[in-house]
Amino acid sequence: MIIVLGIRTDLALEARELYKEREIPGVSIREEGEEGIKITRVKILDERGEKAMGKPVGDYITIEAPGLLERDLDLEERVAKVLANIISELAQLKKDSHVLVVGLGNWNVTPDALGPRVVSNIVVTRHLKEYAPLQFGDEIRSVSAFSPGVLGITGIETAEILKGVVDRVKPDLVITIDALASRRLERLSTTIQISNTGISPGSGVGNRRLSITSESLGVPVIAIGVPTVVDAVTIAHDTIEYLVKELSEQTSKESVFYKVLENMNKQEKYSLIEEVLSPYVQNLVVTPKEIDLLIKNIALVISRGINLALQPGLTEKEMNQLLH
């Protein structure tokens, strides 16, 4: 997670945006897309990039589709297919690979329930491959899935639970899904980040737990995240920035008021935010009132994308039969 003067974001794309148009040593960026969908590929190449971005070396691919807020079924299907292609690209799976899908988060808290919602719509087949191999043959890939809950529910670190499961079922790949924090309201539930560097559960709300990475689990990890909350500090900061800009443009450059605005540095702005939001300055997040519907819709898009990537040999009808 990037934290600059209290402003938090889990998106590598937004960490890159903090540097405006400047080149960042050790970081490459490439943009592509199609109608209604923008894909940004941020690649952190070395330690210089790690230090600048606050994230480990690896690939961070972001899918932005603002139209997802409108419940556009055609767009949802296209986003799911883009997601499937990116997962396939990063995973490089073999036909006999076993994949474990993990829904991180607290199913009792709507903005944090993305992972469990996605897992409930994953086509799980490990038991079918094991107990009915002749019936299902080679057209399906072995997939298992579960939601481990959170430390406050289980009393056990999520990474510890996951490590135990990985050691037991021995997957070739782990895919995690978690809710993230963004610094822009328009990215909530319309942006999907996919990375091959793992994740720290709870980091989206500043509640960092043990990391889930290829190093800690011993198998490759692909992390999928969607921002569902924005830091209140971020909203306050952006409001002050906009207010200062507007007042500066409408005030004579010779006036004392203009000079006060012009000389107001970032630390002074943040001190003002702290005073207003105290005592919750680091613990207050904002989410849309329709978050229930947004989580439901984006969870279906992500689960569809994962199913397409992991089960390319199944038709939609066959997937639905295995789901329900």
Swiss-Prot record:
Functional note: Initiates the rapid degradation of small, acid-soluble proteins during spore germination.
Reactions catalysed, as given in the entry: Endopeptidase action with P4 Glu or Asp, P1 preferably Glu > Asp, P1' hydrophobic and P2' Ala
E.C. designation(s): 3.4.24.78
Enzyme class: hydrolase
Family to which the UniProt record says this protein belongs: Belongs to the peptidase A25 family.
Keyword Disulfide bond among record annotations: no
Family annotation (InterPro entries): Pept_HybD-like_dom_sf, Peptidase_A25
PTM annotation: Autoproteolytically processed. The inactive tetrameric zymogen termed p46 autoprocesses to a smaller form termed p41, which is active only during spore germination.
Keywords: Hydrolase, Protease, Zymogen
Biological processes per GO annotation: proteolysis; spore germination
Pfam family, one: Peptidase_A25
GO molecular function, one term: metalloendopeptidase activity
HAMAP family: Germination_prot (MF_00626)
Organism: Caldanaerobacter subterraneus subsp. tengcongensis (strain DSM 15242 / JCM 11007 / NBRC 100824 / MB4)
Quaternary structure annotation from Swiss-Prot or TrEMBL: Homotetramer.
Propeptide: 1-10
Protein name as catalogued: Germination protease
